Every structure is written in C-alpha cells, then in structure tokens.
Amino acid sequence: MKLSHLDEKNHPKMVDVSDKNITSRMATASGVIYMSQEAFDVIKNNTAKKGPVLQTAIVAAIMGAKKTSEIIPMCHPLMLSKIETDIVEFVKECAFKLIVTVKCEGKTGVEMEALSGVSIGLLTIYDMIKAIDKSMRITDIVLESKEGGKSGKFVRY
C-alpha cells in the first residue's frame, strides 16, 4: 500500500485535494478520562480552583478541532460548519466520556478534527484537575463514525 503523504523520494508531502469534489463530511470521535473519586467530585460539584472544568473542556474541544491543521502537519485547513460536543458521566467508574462531532462541506474529511477535539478536551480536564489527581488516565480515543467522501460511511459498532 502506497502512503499518500509520501512522494516518490519518500519525502513527506501534503496531499493535493484540488481535483476532489466538495461533499458533506461528518465525523464523530470519543475518548474517556478516568480519575479518583475526589477529582470526580470536584468536577461534579464545580469546585475546582481553576474554574468550571467540563465547560472549559467543551470550549477547548471546539478550539482543538478548529486548530487541527496547525498542529497535525499534513492536515488541510478546513472551513468547519459545525462542532458539537457531549459529555457522558460514568459515576461508578469516576470517569467522563467526551464525544465530539465535526461537520464541513469540503474536499477532505474531518476525522482528525474530531479526534483532535476529543484529545484537547480531555487534556484540558487533566490540566485543570492534575493538582488533585496526577494518576488520571486518558484512554480509548477513537473514531466512532464518519460520513462522506470516496471511502463512504464508517461506523465503529
């Protein structure tokens, strides 16, 4: 299999998408952060010294999705038309699952934007609570689904 991000001399390159059709693209990604009961309670009770953790993580996820092409070298800058977030609490496990959905009309997909949004959002939670729990674990950052483009539809489950 030939990698599209390498030229004939094996040098990195950004893929030329100028001949591709503009189509509707959408991707959803998710990830989970596990923490101590104390850290979970601080987030739930909105008593973190750095401010409202989950609300800040949502803003960070949106910013992370928007800035993807600036931090992932071969990603194309995209005009995103929608970024939606959701946070699911797992009380028994002391965990939060962050879900990010990104949409655009473009020539290339938005999977990396969704994955970046999740990663940055979860890292923001870690940053805001690390004084309480340095053993937090960020895990299972995955692409849940994607639509549009040549490769069509993908759904994890």
UniProtKB/Swiss-Prot annotation:
The source's domain of life comes to: Bacteria
Q: Per its UniProt record, what SUPFAM superfamilies does this chain match?
A: Molybdenum cofactor biosynthesis protein C, MoaC
Any coiled-coil regions, as ranges: none
Mind listing the GO molecular function terms for this protein?
A: cyclic pyranopterin monophosphate synthase activity
What is the enzyme's main class? lyase
Q: Specify whether Coiled coil is a keyword of the entry.
A: no
What this protein catalyses is: (8S)-3',8-cyclo-7,8-dihydroguanosine 5'-triphosphate = cyclic pyranopterin phosphate + diphosphate
The record places the active site at: D127
Give the pathway. Answer: Cofactor biosynthesis; molybdopterin biosynthesis
This protein's record includes keyword Thylakoid: no
Positions contributing to substrate binding: M74, C75, H76, M112, E113
E.C. designation(s): 4.6.1.17
Query: Cross-referenced InterPro entries, in alphabetical order?
Result: MoaC, MoaC_bact/euk, MoaC_sf, MoCo_biosynth_MoaA/MoaC, Mopterin_CF_biosynth-C_dom
Q: Name one GO biological process term.
A: Mo-molybdopterin cofactor biosynthetic process
Q: Which Pfam families match?
A: MoaC
Question: What does the UniProt keyword field contain?
Answer: Lyase, Molybdenum cofactor biosynthesis
Main function: Catalyzes the conversion of (8S)-3',8-cyclo-7,8-dihydroguanosine 5'-triphosphate to cyclic pyranopterin monophosphate (cPMP).
Q: How does it assemble?
A: Homohexamer; trimer of dimers.
Family matches, as PANTHER family: MOLYBDOPTERIN COFACTOR SYNTHESIS PROTEIN A
Q: Which family does it belong to?
A: Belongs to the MoaC family.
| Protein name from the UniProt record | Cyclic pyranopterin monophosphate synthase
